[in-house]
């Protein structure tokens, strides 16, 4: 069925892990009649969590689009993971939504996941609604949670449905709009007499009236005159407040037992903005701002907000259409590449179920298979109106591990499989370290990379293991030293001869410099390049641990040659012998890479961060507040001390903190740590190439 944009609601369902987001989505799908049986997260049978890893871990790891059709309205519910290692789902989903439904567990209260969801909605200027799940459980405390919400999120919080425990232990739900109460028997609504919740009832009504009155001058006058609002005025005023962000309505119920979900669904339709209200400012081909509003008759403009890489079906691109329609006959180009995109079938997707649809209309969400060049964040548009929409902002991947191929012969498959994986998870990155030659995969944490490894095996047949990346140390010298390098060898009737005196001295920076200061013709000029080549080749391996030498100047002073036996190769060998003789006597030292740590943490945590930086042999540079009210601690820390910092920061801040780390320079490694690094280098075979 095709819906007009005014009858579509695109809603991000977000919150802390385990708060009941997926169960709520599954329950709403079941109540709509789309499924005959309600799936369970514990059994791995929900429409949202269809990935094998999700079923195994009993948690959402990917965002899922679940369309729920009810009473002439289509609700595109974008169920996103609550685990912090999988925040990419929320980052991509928010770009396709007009509203955020924040789930809060009736048992756990307002946790970090709810805070993050609220901040995400604020940052992206999306309407907000709160649903308190598990409200029928004995240890659920709605009014305590309501206070937490007000403390965390301010005066916009406005209760609309509240629970009341009855004498028989069951829970009824009071609709403050209609001032009626209902209980639920096998998911069916039954009206009952209004339970007595004491002075709270009048206070709740008064608070709701006050919030609604602030949205309209006429309602404000009526409020001050003490006149009650009609149900229509309540709904209209509440919807206006939700659109402007003045009001964040709070509902409650039980997804497992299908309680009060009818009231939630009705008010999602009445209070949350429709897809018709969406407007995005992009850029045209001349980088000028262009506002795209939802309009079926305008040139096509659509946005790829999510990609799924399937080894059998191919790439599946999830698309939000902003204007026009998208169908198999649409003439569109990729604004990033300028190339046309041939469209195959357009699809409606519900979890893993795909259904053909004639077109994806303006305001709606659907999918297209096997697009040639499009990737997440790309804009598909009519060539007559080329527009590039803003790309999503993804969390920074700071947890690095090295890749080791499990099966011999799979080396060539790894980069291709990882490229496919990165298509569907842009928070993952993959590089080859030019120093260590290791393949490095980066993600948001240990779970993130564990799941990536599992997907590579299950989806692409590539098996890898992860190990701690090697640290790219360097070596240098502290003093000058001069040494002779004499290469003389007789092979049959032809000999090899090269003789040099080279002075090696430390210099600032990380270069290896070569100079010559030869008087007379002791070493002919045509052999100078060979001497330099020998020095540079030798400097690839230090004498302590085999790491590259930096901050070194080599000056050719003297030497000798043979008119017949001297050659380029002989002088290369002579230069290497001089290097090997001089460097051990020049005070060789190991250098460790140092990076700048920029950690964003709540106001309560800077002291802990500074203490941890000191423990990790770092130096605190300063601290400043950021635009989100958090504190930003800047420090310099050795790279070798940063491997587990992601885990530390997450535990310290309960997932609120994040950081970046960028290499800045090399510094001398403390002598007490040299022996350990040298031993590790020998175990890794750092001297193998040099000795060969």
Region locations from a protein language model:
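Structural and coupling elements of P-loop NTPases
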Residues: 1-692
């Amino acid at each position: 069925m095709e819906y007009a944009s005014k009858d579509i609601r695109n809603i991000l369902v977000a919150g802390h892990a385990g708060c009941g987001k997926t169960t709520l989505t599954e329950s709403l799908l079941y109540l709509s009649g789309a499924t005959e049986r309600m799936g369970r997260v514990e059994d791995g049978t929900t429409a949202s969590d269809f990935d094998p890893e999700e079923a195994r871990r009993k948690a959402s790891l990917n965002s899922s689009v679940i369309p729920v059709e009810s009473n002439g309205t289509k609700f595109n519910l974008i169920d996103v993971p609550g685990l912090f290692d999988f925040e990419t789902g929320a980052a991509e989903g928010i770009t396709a939504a007009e509203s955020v439904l924040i789930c809060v567990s009736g048992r756990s209260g307002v946790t970090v996941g709810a805070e993050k969801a609220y901040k995400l909605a604020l940052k992206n200027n999306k309407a907000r609604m709160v649903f308190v799940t598990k409200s029928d459980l004995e240890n659920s405390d709605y009014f305590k949670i309501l206070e937490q919400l007000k403390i965390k999120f301010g005066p916009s919080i406005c209760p609309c449905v509240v629970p009341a425990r009855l004498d028989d232990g069951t829970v009824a739900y009071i609709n403050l709009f209609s001032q009626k109460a209902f209980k639920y028997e096998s998911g069916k609504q039954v009206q009952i007499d209004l339970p007595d919740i004491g002075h709270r009832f009048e206070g709740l009504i008064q608070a709701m009236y006050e919030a609604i009155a602030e949205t309209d001058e006429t309602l404000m006058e009526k409020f001050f005159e003490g006149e009650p609002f009609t149900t229509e005025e309540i709904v209209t005023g509440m919807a206006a407040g939700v659109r402007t962000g003045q009001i964040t309505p709070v509902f409650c119920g039980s997804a497992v037992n299908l309680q009060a979900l009818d009231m939630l669904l009705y008010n999602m339709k009445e209070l949350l903005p429709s897809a018709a209200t969406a407007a995005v400012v992009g850029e045209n081909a001349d980088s000028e701002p262009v506002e795209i509003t939802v309009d079926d008759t305008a040139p096509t403009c659509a946005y790829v907000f999510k990609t799924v890489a399937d080894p059998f079906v191919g790439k599946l691109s999830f698309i939000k259409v902003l204007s026009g329609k998208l169908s198999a006959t649409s003439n569109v180009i990729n604004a990033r590449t300028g190339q046309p995109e041939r469209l195959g079938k357009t699809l409606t997707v519900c979890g893993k179920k795909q259904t053909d649809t004639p077109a994806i209309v303006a305001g709606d969400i659907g999918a297209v298979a096997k697009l040639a060049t499009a990737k997440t964040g790309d804009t598909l548009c009519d060539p007559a109106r080329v527009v590039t929409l803003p790309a999503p902002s993804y969390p920074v991947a700071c947890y690095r591990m090295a890749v080791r191929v499990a099966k011999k012969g799979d080396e060539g498959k790894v980069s291709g499989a990882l490229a496919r994986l990165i298509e569907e998870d842009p928070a993952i990155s993959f590089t080859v370290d030019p120093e260590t030659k290791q393949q490095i995969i980066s993600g948001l944490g240990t779970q993130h990379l564990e799941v990536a490894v599992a997907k590579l095996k299950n989806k692409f047949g590539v098996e890898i293991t992860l190990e701690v990346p090697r640290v790219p140390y360097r070596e240098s010298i502290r003093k000058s030293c001069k040494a002779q390098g004499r290469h003389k060898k007789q092979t049959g009737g032809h000999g090899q001869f090269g003789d040099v005196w080279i002075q090696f001295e430390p210099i600032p920076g990380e270069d290896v410099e070569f100079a010559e200061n030869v008087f007379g013709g002791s070493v002919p000029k045509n052999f100078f390049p060979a001497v330099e080549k020998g020095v540079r080749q030798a400097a690839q391996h230090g004498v302590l641990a085999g790491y590259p030498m930096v901050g070194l100047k080599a000056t050719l002073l003297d030497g000798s040659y043979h008119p017949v036996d001297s050659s380029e190769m002989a002088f290369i060998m002579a230069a290497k012998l001089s290097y090997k003789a001089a460097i051990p006597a020049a005070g060789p030292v190991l250098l460790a890479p140092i990076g700048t740590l920029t950690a964003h943490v709540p106001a309560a945590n800077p002291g802990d961060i500074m203490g941890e930086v000191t423990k990790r042999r770092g130096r605190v540079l300063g601290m400043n507040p950021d635009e989100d009210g958090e504190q930003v601690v800047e420090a310099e820390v050795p790279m070798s001390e940063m491997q587990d910092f992601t885990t530390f920061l997450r535990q310290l801040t309960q997932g609120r903190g994040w950081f970046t780390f960028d290499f800045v320079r090399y510094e001398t490694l403390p002598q007490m740590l040299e022996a350990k690094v040298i031993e590790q280098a020998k175990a890794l075979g750092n001297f193998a190439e040099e000795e060969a």
